[in-house]
Design a protein with these regions (language model features):
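A short helix-to-beta-strand connector/capping loop
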Residues: 1, 74, 163-166
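Active-site-proximal loop/helix segment associated with metal-binding centers of metalloenzymes
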Residues: 3-79, 83-91, 98-100
Length: 192
């Protein structure tokens, strides 16, 4: 619950889409300083307040509404399929914390192969992510000419020339964590 998914059409030889996935939730946080200041010891009574229940302790009433603050947390990712025009995602980029988008080749290779393949270069994707102020970028859908980590280095280098956020090269089966703060972390096998 709390998920919202929307689609945006992309530009490719066959129908292709990007999906914006947003998760919002209400978070309750105890005002610990106020509870200590009003002499309510930490323990099960705090749990009752956290659950929204008023507490009566040593002749004093502790209304949950005075000690529990609610705020909204959200995470938002935009995941694109085949696309030669990253700017098509402009309208969908509001609030996005991570963009997963193809960078099939470097701009030099893109210029050589021409427009027909209808894929984005690392430069195009990085420029869009920078312009849209998206803090994290995951590049994916690499041409077969980039067949190992060393061969992928020019894609990463090109992206970093045009984008100054966190950049990752997608790997099969890799997992990441996106925190409400916008921090984007690769997970190790033990974290997953």
């Amino acid at each position: 619950d709390g998920f919202e998914i929307s689609a945006a059409a992309l530009n490719h030889r066959v129908p292709s889409y990007a999906y914006k996935i947003r998760h919002q939730r209400q978070v309750k946080q105890l005002d610990r300083d106020a509870l200590y200041a009003h002499d309510l010891p930490a323990g099960p009574l705090w749990g009752m307040l956290q659950n929204g229940d008023d507490v009566y302790y040593q002749g004093r009433n502790y209304p949950a509404s005075l000690y529990v603050e609610q705020h909204e947390q959200q995470v938002c990712a935009l995941i694109g399929g085949d696309n030669d025009t990253p700017s098509l995602l402009q309208a969908a980029s509001d609030g996005v914390q991570v963009l997963v988008h193809e960078a099939t080749y470097t701009q030099e290779v893109a210029d050589k192969v021409g427009a027909f393949p209808m894929h984005s270069s690392a430069k195009q994707t990085a420029e869009f992510a920078y312009q849209a102020a998206i803090p994290n970028l995951v590049l994916t859908h690499f041409s077969a000419r980039y067949n190992d980590a060393q061969a992928l280095a020019p894609l990463l280098a090109e992206a970093k020339l045009y984008y100054h956020g966190q950049v990752h090269l997608a790997e099969d089966f890799a997992q990441y964590r996106l925190l409400p703060s916008g921090e984007f972390q690769p997970l190790s096998a033990s974290d997953a």
